[in-house]
Amino acid sequence: MWVYGKPVASSVCMVSTNSLAQRLGHSADAKLVILSCDDLGAFHAANVGVYDALRKGSATCASLMVPAPWAKHAVMNYNGDDIGVHLTVNSEHEMYRWGPLTYAPSLQSGEGGFPRTIDDLWEHADPAEVLRECRAQIARALEWGIDVSHLAPHLTAITLRPQFFDVYIELAVEFQLPVRLPSTLTEAQAGFPFRKLAAEEGVLFPDHFDHDWREGSRERVLNSLRNLQPGVTEIHVQPCIDTPEIRALGDIANSWIDDYNFVVNDASLKQAIADSGAIMIGYRALRDAMRAQ
């Protein structure tokens, strides 16, 4: 097994019998919540929105899209926040594109940049090029001075196919970083035991995560808090401030702007968190526990 590019003892892979909450220093029935922000670095509006959500609102961590156009701006405004790498091999917007850091012909679409859809990616991507590209994104974030706390794939692109999931877990082990994994998909639906495979490699991940990517987070977040289960639950949002730049992408911007108002300005979220009994944490707690095992 390899960590930070160096071989380490196989005992690192031993799976603890304690619950994740217990490994984080809490009781087994504790309800811990990670409120994460996606797409830091994608837009200027996202950078301002995400940092406001972290510093003024209820969010606890975020993930950086290293190949995206505003990534360097996000880094320039970084101040030790709990930030992971949003492993990116798709570019979903028709008029706003980004592409690989590395030479990766199989990750280029006909219109330039990464493929727009997951199906297009899955049809053409070479796993070796996906591995090299994703490793480069993590390395770039570290070189920029980000204290990387976790890995979270953009659009779940490398989670739900075995050949790309292998890449995901290899990098999690190499850099000793926890990962985001959906809990609402069964092994039968995915076609392979992805959560079991990650656990067997000693990779930590939240107990609960609903990978619902439909627009708008308000009701989904409130429903998750009303029905909070013991363990670690990740809930994701995508906050952006209201600017002409983000409005130019179309109606999809409405949900991102609402996410911002909800997470930063809406007292109902703070009340829902208090009513749920949630203990708010970030991914850094999982990373530190993973590296201590």
Predicted region positions:
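C-terminal domain-boundary segment and adjacent tail
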Residues: 180, 249-293
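A short alpha/beta connector and helix-capping loop motif
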Residues: 44-69
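Structural preference for beta-strand elements that scaffold enzyme active sites
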Residues: 32-34, 59-61, 80-86, 148-152, ...
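N-terminal pre-catalytic segment of deacetylase/amide-hydrolase enzymes
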Residues: 2-34
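Active-site beta-loop-alpha junctions enriched in small/polar residues
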Residues: 38-40, 65-69, 86-90, 154-156, ...
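Catalytic domains of cell-wall/extracellular-matrix polysaccharide-remodeling enzymes
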Residues: 127, 135-204, 211-219, 226
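Acidic (Asp/Glu)-rich catalytic clusters
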Residues: 50-56, 71-84, 99-109, 143, ...
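Active-site gating loops and adjacent loop-to-helix segments of metal-dependent hydrolytic enzymes
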Residues: 94-122, 251-254
